[in-house]
Amino acid sequence: MTDEELTRGPSSSGNVPAVSARGFGYRHAGRKAAVLNDITLDVERGEKVLLLGASGVGKSTLLAAIAGVLGDDSDGEATGELLIEGCTPASARGAVGLVLQDPDSQTISARVGDDVAFGAENLGVAPAEIGNRVRASLDVVGLD
């Protein structure tokens, strides 16, 4: 991202936006310059958004921030506000999915169902319920 501010304005529905950023910025640990500066935007539930920019400008960092997977303070410094349906990204973790740029680098197991189960395990889903959730999740995206 550049220093240019992205602005969508207030929610027309009056509801809490799915994603809301106000002056959000992020600097990776060990870097002098922030990769994200003063990002302001609202994304409504169901809205489709294209995030476009040159390599290295912060697209993946913004998406990782929204998904709540940027790490702790030792990994970098966030400024401003970023909310997912009114909650911090860390407290909303699991409500937002993130597909990485290289799909091969994000699969660990030989079977996709095992990777889906891994996510459920990390969210604390009861072991007896994981199989049902894995099947339901794979059905939603047309995998069996």
Where are these regions (language model features)?
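Conserved ABC transporter NBD signature motif
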Residues: 75-94
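ABC nucleotide-binding domain signature
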Residues: 50, 90, 94-104, 110, ...
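A short, flexible loop at the N-terminus of ABC-type nucleotide-binding domains that lies
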Residues: 9-38, 70-75, 88, 127
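Conserved hydrophobic segment flanking the Walker A/P-loop of ABC-type ATPase nucleotide-binding domains
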Residues: 43-45, 91
